[in-house]
Amino acid sequence: MTLNRRQFLSSGVAVGAAIGVPRMALAAEKADVVIVGAGLSGLRSAEMLVEQGLKVVLLDANNRVGGRVQTVQTVDGPIDVGASQVGRGYARVLDACERHGLKLISEDRDLLTFGSHFSGEWIDGKNWAANPLNQCVGDERKIPPNLIGQALSAKYNPLQELDDWLDPRFSEYDISLRELLTRKGHSAQAIELAAYSAPGIGIDETSVLRMWQEEVRGRIERRMSEAAATPSAESGAKRDHAFGEANDHKSVGGLAAINNIVGGCSALPLAMASKLGDRVRLGKRAVGIALSDTGGTVTCSDGSVYSGRFLICTIPFSMLREVEITGNANPIARQAITTMPYANTARLYVTVERPFWKEDGLPPSISSDGPMGMFWAIDNHSGEGAHRGMFVLVGRTAQAVSVLDRADAEALLIGELARLRPASRGAIRVATWKDWLRDPLQRGCGFSLAPGQVNAFARDMIKPWQVMHFAGEHTRRTDFGMESAMESAERAAIEILERTA
């Protein structure tokens, strides 16, 4: 019997749990399904399989659940240093919050006005077209330098459907943004400036198809926001920053355009894990996976062994490539696991003790071409006193800062801000820091695909490897953010139920 999603969710059918295990794992702890990775995808897969009567064990190397969902408790309150935003279109995440009794609030992270600092000078975006530094050509000249990468990437996006990025009809676009802009005849300066706001790892390192997948999915959230927007709400056309979505706080069905979980986003994986109980095993780092046609075995660094009729691997490929996998040859999966790059985001979360921008007269927030990347000043809705702020590093700057330890990174960023904005001296108090590339159990904030990799393996890399199925945001097909993790969990669980029916 084949179960589609609707049939599975409505059937309530209990799948028999008396499933054999491979002879090689008879001494191991046995389960119907062993899941590696207790992030959202692993937890949701486990929930779905347990609901259908299967015996599940869920392993994670960390001492906490959640993966890249992480809330840090600070003197200023909880701060989400990983996933945090729940959009109106996040159907699966919204359903999970409702099932676990979690409340949502409109995200309070409106960014104050941006200025740009390029080539040693402050740039007024409104007058950029007439600036002597502007060596762009034609319509390029109208785009502020901190927006040109995302603007030009979106301009040439022909994709309409959520899964078009995987359609071979668009295989010619499995190239870098630099190659695309060169083919389209853009000026050298436009291409150089595009590097500072290019989505993904960078203008050379990320396939345009990977960039466009996010852009197409983002359109859905923006259209939902625009449909509900008040006349004064910020629209995409008015944005003065390339990264960080603008929130329309108007409540539609109890939801703003962007929402946060009360108490921090970690409340969701914690609630999911609590329901699963002792099926979740922390401190279990997989070092070996042995596959056959009848079962699989996971060996952990502490010597413990777990065997299952099926496995689900949800850990990022940046970590899976360190696990010894034995089984039938699978060149597509091997290539994906070995070579898939991971982007980085590094953020320094701070309190701005006084609004120093009132002293120097410059815009509160900054996009720069220097090592600081961006500084986001967050509206406190009064304009006076302390404000929250963030140093946000993506692309080149994020890769560069990852060679520094926390103390050196903090000193670099605060020092660079003071160099550009002397009025900021003494006004910055650090709350917390997160560099995902330096996280030893993640090694990046999200998957990427290099030019050529969509054609090489992205379409087929999610297919099961004998009894091992793949989930995690890196296996997304149509979604992004936390919703992509839940999407992949749903797919992997249904794949296994189809094989056991």
Q: Where in the sequence are the language-model features?
A:
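FAD-dinucleotide binding site
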Residues: T2-A501
